[in-house]
Swiss-Prot record:
[4Fe-4S] cluster binds at residues 5, 8, 17, 23. Keywords: 4Fe-4S, Cytoplasm, Iron, Iron-sulfur, Metal-binding, Oxidoreductase. GO terms for molecular function: 4 iron, 4 sulfur cluster binding; hydroxylamine reductase activity; metal ion binding; peroxidase activity. GO terms for cellular component: cytoplasm. Binds 1 [4Fe-4S] cluster. Binds 1 hybrid [4Fe-2O-2S] cluster. It is found in: Cytoplasm. Its cofactor is [4Fe-4S] cluster; hybrid [4Fe-2O-2S] cluster. NCBIfam families: hybrid_clust, PRK05290.1. Hybrid [4Fe-2O-2S] cluster binds at residues 243, 267, 311, 404, 432, 457, 492, 494. This is Hydroxylamine reductase. Its EC number is 1.7.99.1. The modification Cysteine persulfide is found at residue 404. The gene is hcp.
Amino acid sequence: MSMFCFQCQEALKGEGCTAIGVCGKTSEVSNLQDLLVYVLKGISICQNEARKQGVSRKEADTFIMDGLFMTITNVNFDDSRFIEKIKAGIELREQIKAALENAGAKLPENLPDAATWTAETDEAIHLKSHGEEIRATKTDDIHSLRELIVYGVKGMAAYAQHAANLGFENPEIYAFMEKALAATIDDSLTIDELLALTLETGKYGVDVMALLDKANTETFGNPEVTTVKLGVRKNPGILISGHDLKDLEELLVQTEGTGVDVYTHCEMLPAHYYPAFKKYEHFVGNYGNAWWQQKEEFESFNGPILFTTNCLVPPAQNASYRDKVYTTGAVGFPGFKHVTENAEGKKDYSEIIAQAKTCAAPKSIESGELVGGFAHHQVIALADKVVDAVKSGAIKQFFVMAGCDGRMPNRNYYSEFAENLPQDTVILTAGCAKFRYNKLPLGDIGGIPRVLDAGQCNDSYSLAVIALKLKEVFGLEDVNELPISYNIAWYEQKAVIVLLALLALGVKNIHLGPTLPAFLSPGVAGVLVEKFGIAGVGAVSDDIAQFMSR
C-alpha cells in the first residue's frame, strides 16, 4: 500500500484509504502528515523533559498545536508546507535538547526514533514518510487506543489554536497534549493506562472547549437569538468558510466601505449570532450548505472564497473558482494563494478584496432565513420557559444531534431522523451536522424552535453546560437522568474530542454514526459499549422508538 489513513468517518470501505484519500489527499501528503505527527511526538518527549527542568520552550507548544491542526481532515493538502514544517520541527527539537544540556539535564537513554531521527533533504523526508513505523496500520487494542488519543489531541489542538488566536491560552492544555503524544509511543503503557489517558483526553477536551467559549464570548459577546438571511444582494461578495472568528473580524474590518459584501459558509454560519459582528452592514448572511457541497456552491457564488480552517474539498481541474480560493492559518492547497500574518500578527486581505471587486454578485441559490444563537448563555436566560415546557409535558425529550456532516448517502439518516421525531421533542445542535435538518419546517413548541442551534462544533460545550444546568434545576444526581438523548454524527478529529469530552462528563448511551470509527478495534469498541453504552445507528424508526422508550 502507498498510504494508510483511517482517521475520518469516510475511510474507504470502513477500513482505511490505501492509495488516495477519499478526502482527496494524495498518498504523498498522507505520508507526510503521518511523519509530521511522528516528529511532533519526538518534540513532545523532549519538551516534557524540558518542562520538568524549567527550560521548556513556549514556541514548541505553539508549534505542536499548529502542526497537529495541519493534519486534521480537509485542512491542508500542500506537501511543501508539510516538508517545511517537518524540517522546522527537527530543528526545534534539537534546540530543546541543547537547552536541556545547557541546564545540566540529561534526556533519557534509548530515546525512541521519533526523538532522534533527522533529515536535511526533501528526499530523505519523503523516504522516511514511507516507512512502516510511521503509519498507523495496526488494529490491536493498544494501537487503537493510541490512535483514539492522537485524534482527540488533534481536535484539542484546533480548538486551542482558535482560542490562542484571540489571546486566550492555558499552559496546562499544551502540557497535556505533549504528555499524551509522548505516551502514544511509550511501549510500557498498558491497555488500562491508555484507557485512563483516553478519558483524561476527554477531560482536557472539556477544558479546551471552555477556554474557546471564554475566548469567543469575551471577545465578541454572548451569542443571542438571531435571524440569518439566506439570500443574496447585488454587490460582489467574499465567502468565508471555516471556524476562525478572528479571521472573520479582520476581513469585516478591511471590507467595510469597499462595496464588497461578506457571506458565511458552513461552520462560519454561527458567527452571525455574536453581537460584535452585527454592526457590519455588509455582513449579509449565509450562502450554501455543508462543506461537501462546496464544488457546486462555489461555482455559483462567483466571488472569492477564504478558508480559515477545514473543510476544503480539492476543486476539479476545470473549476471556475480555482483562482479565487485563498487559504490562511493551517489551511493549504497547492496553487492557492495563502494569506500569512505580518510581524504585528495582522493579515492583509487587500488582494482578495481587490479580486472580489472584479467579480459578479453571487447567484441566488435559495431564499429565506434561519434562526440560531442558542448557546448556553441564551438558553439559560430562557431556562424558566424551557423548564415549564418540560414540566407541563409540552417537551417530552431533547435530542443532542451535534457533530459533523459528510458526503456519504447514509447521512440522509439524520434528515429522516429529525423529520420523524415526535412533535413534542426538541433538537439541540452544534456543528455542520445541522445542515441535514436546520432548513426543514419542524416548527416550534410554545415559541421554542424545535431546532436550537448553539453554534460551531466546539459549541457542543454549550450543550453540555445546558445539560448540567438542567440537571441542577431539576435536582437530579446524574446527567443521564435528564430527558436528553444523544445521536451524534461524526466526521473528523474535532468530533473525536467532542465525543471524549462527553464521556469525561459522564454522558452515557451516545449513538454515534453514520458508522463507527474504523480506528476502533473490536476490543476498544467493546469497552466503549460496556462502560459508556456507545452504540451505532440503525433504522430511523427503530432508533426513535428505542430513544423514546428510555
